[in-house]
């Protein structure tokens, strides 16, 4: 609510009654409180939505540069998601804890499937995290597809209830390019936490919810895959059929990146790119999906966390989950076309 100046009430006579000094002082104090409240409210509405580091004046996220990460206090928990992060003698950021991306994913037959909640809880507790722990997620940063790993884990942790999250933009590639310190010494295991999940299901789109919203103009189903997957010319190995969700529109997650770069560009650039999003009249919610919720996590992260688009959810199982359920699909090639595609791939 904005504060608005109101004219003083009209005097009841040509010469209004004189007020005591105490009365005038009370009115001045009341006016001061009102102006302070207005300024506070306006300041809150204009404040950036970065996460804070509890106990300090520093803020970070949802993206953080290598240089900024190097200045943060040691209480910030750095999670290394690289496949070889847990291997012996692997160079890493000092203080980083190894939790390879595969630890956060489903089985190879359906990688996008959410783990059972007790497994997520045990993993978060092992890393010593709770809902107030500031967390920075680090991947290799080699290419745009790699960004899906920290984006998916960021989404997972936010869904589980963690509040202070950031991704190292450009990952280890950016850290090494900045000539920042590395170590091969293993990080001591933290004291396990007593973390209890506080699920935010507004971030999650389940298969049944997607099925319910098919054809509904208020929900934009956004396919984050390359065009060939969207058109049914290619399919993920774990998917039972090629194609996409009925009524879906496509926006390849690669659009957010400069060619060959694993780091997101400036917010102003992302805003210009977002202006190219496909439009669906009446849509108030976006459901981001791909093959296994990996590329889709990048679209979700940029739209929801960086550009602050409201009502963006992720379908974690995506097309692998959907196609195996024998649910309706669009752009499904004929059997002959599928055989031809298989032959050409040999």
Annotate each PLM feature.
Residues 53-65, 71, 105, 173-246, ...:
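Active-site neighborhoods of enzymes that stabilize oxyanions during catalysis
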Residues 6-30:
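Bacterial N-terminal signal peptides that target proteins for export
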Residues 38-51:
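Signal peptide processing junction and immediate N-terminal pro/mature segment
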Residues 114-209, 213, 234, 243, ...:
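Thiolate-centered catalytic microenvironments shared by cysteine-dependent enzyme domains
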Residues 54-132, 140-145, 213-283:
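Positively charged, proline/Ser/Thr-rich regional signature most characteristic
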């Amino acid at each position: 609510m904005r504060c608005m100046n109101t004219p003083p009430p009209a005097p009841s006579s040509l010469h209004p009654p004189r007020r005591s000094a105490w009365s005038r002082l009370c009115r001045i104090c009341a006016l001061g409180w009102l102006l302070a409240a207005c300024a506070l409210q306006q300041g809150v509405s204009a404040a950036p939505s970065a996460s804070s580091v509890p106990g300090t004046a520093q803020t970070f996220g949802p993206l953080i540069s290598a240089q900024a990460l190097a200045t943060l206090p040691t209480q910030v928990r750095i999670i290394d998601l690289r496949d070889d992060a847990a291997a012996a003698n692997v160079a890493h950021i000092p203080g980083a804890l190894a939790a390879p991306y595969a630890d956060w994913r489903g089985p190879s037959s359906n990688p996008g499937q959410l783990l059972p909640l007790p497994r997520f809880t045990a993993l978060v507790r092992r890393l010593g995290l709770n809902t107030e722990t500031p967390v920075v997620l680090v991947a290799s940063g080699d290419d745009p597809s790699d960004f899906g790993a920290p984006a998916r884990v960021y989404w997972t942790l936010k869904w589980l209830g963690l509040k202070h999250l950031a991704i190292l933009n450009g990952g280890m590639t950016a850290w090494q390019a900045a000539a920042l310190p590395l170590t091969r010494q293993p990080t001591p295991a933290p004291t396990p936490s007593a973390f209890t999940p506080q699920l935010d299901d507004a971030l999650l789109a389940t298969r049944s919810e997607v099925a319910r919203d098919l054809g509904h103009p208020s929900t934009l189903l956004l396919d984050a895959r390359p065009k060939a997957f969207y058109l049914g010319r290619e399919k993920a190995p774990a998917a039972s059929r090629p194609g996409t969700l009925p009524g879906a529109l496509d926006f390849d997650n690669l659009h957010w990146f400069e060619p060959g770069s694993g780091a997101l560009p400036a917010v102003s650039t992302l805003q210009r790119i977002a202006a190219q999003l496909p439009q669906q009249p009446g849509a108030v919610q976006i459901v981001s999906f791909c093959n296994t919720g990996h590329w889709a996590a990048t679209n979700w992260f940029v739209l929801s966390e960086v550009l602050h688009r409201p009502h963006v959810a992720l379908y974690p199982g995506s097309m692998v989950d959907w196609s195996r359920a024998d649910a309706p699909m669009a752009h499904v090639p004929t059997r002959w076309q599928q055989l031809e595609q298989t032959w050409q791939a040999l």
